[in-house]
């Protein structure tokens, strides 16, 4: 996959997921990324710093003008901690942890987040409103309930399977209750 094609497909994916998940300024968007899978390898075995940089930079170019924060999930070697802007961590009172990602502990996406964010820190956990999983990294633990699967308009990025999640408030009250319109499914 050519790098410009990778950037364009990433941009299309993120713009589509942001629109369909109905998130806006102040929201958090989580990224799970296996650059190994993108280049056709096995998750965690062929990490590519350049692929991570291209994807994260492109995602930030889409999210930042909309006021949406990016949280980049690390691998299980870092207990799936996330890189976020310090501003977000302090505003949301997130638990900051002391670790610096490497290519094989945290991964290429986290390294890229440290390259492109203004004041990046690692946090232990987060509850994002939506997210994208590039390479079956399992982002579900970081997306708030109730999670709504979104079928991405592009199902693979390079060799990586792509899935996405949005979230909506819980519906409570049962048969007698009335609800606001669902902005994700647009009932």
UniProtKB/Swiss-Prot annotation:
> InterPro entries from the xrefs?
Antibiotic_NAT-like, DUF436
The record's similarity note reads: Belongs to the UPF0340 family.
Q: What's the protein called, per UniProt?
A: UPF0340 protein str1894
Origin organism is Streptococcus thermophilus (strain CNRZ 1066)
